[in-house]
């Protein structure tokens, strides 16, 4: 009996030793590389393969991993360069295969419309024992770091963009869910200004990207902060909250509008990022230290301001609520003012081929004193020390029209006719010349 137990123990030791040798050979051979390639490919929903693995203890290195997308995935291609990883073999005793740390030198990822390709039939596999059958069905990666990540994309409309030169650190919290931190990098999409990324924190899983906090800047000192959610399973439906400060007005308004100042505000974007320009933007905007050439819309008001000693019109601030969609902007609760001399309030809309606004304009007696009859016939309401009137704006952004001049001339004509009678014609001509200098 004693000899039998010794023999049985020797056999068990031999089996375990042989199994270890076999498993050791399997891990360091192409079979494990194939198994690992399939697991990673399934995770990124692509077809990929590792370059040969070289081992040092429980760590391995590979020159890279390359993958191509499929028709059901927006990932078109993925190339990972110079990979090093460490496997925690002790987790096998718990039924898990865990890579606890991965370091990557560079990633190049290309997203867009899925690649049309046929699905090859799997080659029949002969039955038999495989060491891969002993491995857990799931592979877990606890943490990875990318020294240089670059993501490129193209929308369904053909607009391209990229997020380049960023460092990414990611930690897996649960199956297919990662906490992501990106530091540095540049984002550019279509013809929009380049955004410099300071730091981004978020979560990504199979269904969505959640941005917990993203901080960025534009040239000129503009600060941007973003939070929100982007669906990635099918359509790129997004809800993004954007706060910004010190945005130069020439980034937003055409040069012909002659606006100057710094914008700040809070905006909410809702829409499909594949059709970004069709999304809806709502929120509020404020412009401080504003300079504006009133002649672009209010030619009359511009001249009155000059005659009133306000040659360079600088508004203390402009505030408004906006709603933008399909290249059309609606504004409400619009308020603009200059000291105690000028106030403009109202609402309206602006599009590529139209301007439509209903405003009320308040002017000081100092300005109105230059136009006889203006207070009595046009600026008839008094409030907050100003005289007010309604103004209708129409036309196009290139050629806006207002109905103020006609009413001022009519009031002036009536005033002159009543006071000077026969000399009214010359007085009216003088006024028209004055208003159109």
Where on the chain are the PLM-derived regions?
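N-terminal type II signal-anchor transmembrane helix
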Residues: 1-45, 426
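Elongated, acidic membrane-bridging lipid-handling scaffolds
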Residues: 124-223, 228, 326
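Extended terminal
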Residues: 1-9, 272-277, 309-437
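Secondary-structure transition motifs
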Residues: 63-175, 290-313, 406-407
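N-terminal leader/targeting pre-sequences
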Residues: 45-71
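Outer-envelope beta-barrel architecture signal
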Residues: 98-100, 142, 176, 236-238, ...
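Amphipathic hydrophobic-ligand
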Residues: 41-46, 72-87, 99, 125, ...
């Amino acid at each position: 009996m004693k000899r039998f137990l010794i023999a049985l123990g020797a056999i068990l030791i031999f089996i375990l030793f042989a199994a270890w040798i076999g498993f050791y050979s399997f891990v360091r051979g192409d079979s494990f590389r194939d198994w690992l390639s399939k697991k990673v490919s399934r995770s990124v929903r692509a077809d990929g393969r590792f370059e040969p693995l070289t081992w040092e203890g429980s760590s391995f290195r590979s020159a890279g991993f390359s993958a191509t997308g499929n028709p059901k995935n927006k990932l078109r291609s993925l190339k990972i360069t110079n990979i090093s990883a460490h496997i925690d073999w002790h987790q096998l005793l718990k039924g898990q295969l865990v890579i606890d740390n991965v370091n990557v030198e560079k990633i190049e990822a290309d997203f867009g419309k899925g690649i049309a390709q046929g699905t090859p039939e799997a080659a029949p596999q002969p039955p038999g024992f495989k060491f891969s059958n002993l491995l857990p069905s799931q592979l877990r990666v606890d943490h990875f770091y990318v020294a240089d990540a670059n993501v490129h994309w193209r929308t369904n409309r053909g607009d391209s963009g990229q997020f380049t030169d960023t460092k990414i650190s990611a930690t897996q919290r649960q199956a297919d869910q990662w906490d992501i931190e990106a530091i540095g990098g540049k984002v550019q999409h279509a013809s929009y200004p380049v955004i410099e990324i300071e730091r981004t924190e978020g979560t990504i899983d199979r269904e969505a990207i959640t941005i917990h906090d993203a901080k960025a800047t534009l040239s000129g000192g503009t600060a941007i902060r973003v939070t929100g959610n982007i669906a990635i399973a099918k359509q790129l439906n997004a809800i993004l909250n954007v706060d910004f400060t010190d945005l130069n007005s020439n980034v937003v308004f055409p040069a012909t509008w002659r606006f100057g100042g710094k914008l700040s505000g809070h905006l909410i974007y809702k829409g499909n990022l594949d059709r970004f320009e069709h999304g809806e933007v709502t929120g509020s905007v404020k412009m401080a230290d504003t300079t504006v050439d009133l002649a672009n819309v209010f030619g009359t008001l511009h001249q009155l301001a000059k005659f009133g000693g306000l040659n360079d019109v600088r508004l203390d601030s402009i505030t408004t609520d906006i709603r933008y969609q399909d290249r059309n902007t609606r504004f409400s609760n619009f308020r603009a003012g200059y000291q105690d001399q000028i106030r403009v309030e109202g609402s309206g809309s602006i599009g590529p081929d139209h301007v439509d606004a209903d405003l009320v304009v308040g002017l000081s007696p100092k300005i109105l004193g230059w136009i006889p009859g203006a207070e009595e016939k046009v600026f008839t309401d008094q409030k907050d020390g100003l005289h007010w009137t309604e103004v209708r704006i129409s036309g196009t952004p290139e050629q806006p029209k207002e109905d103020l001049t006609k009413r001022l001339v009519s009031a002036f004509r009536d005033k002159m006719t009543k006071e000077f009678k026969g000399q009214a014609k010359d007085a009216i001509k003088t006024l028209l010349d004055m208003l159109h200098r």
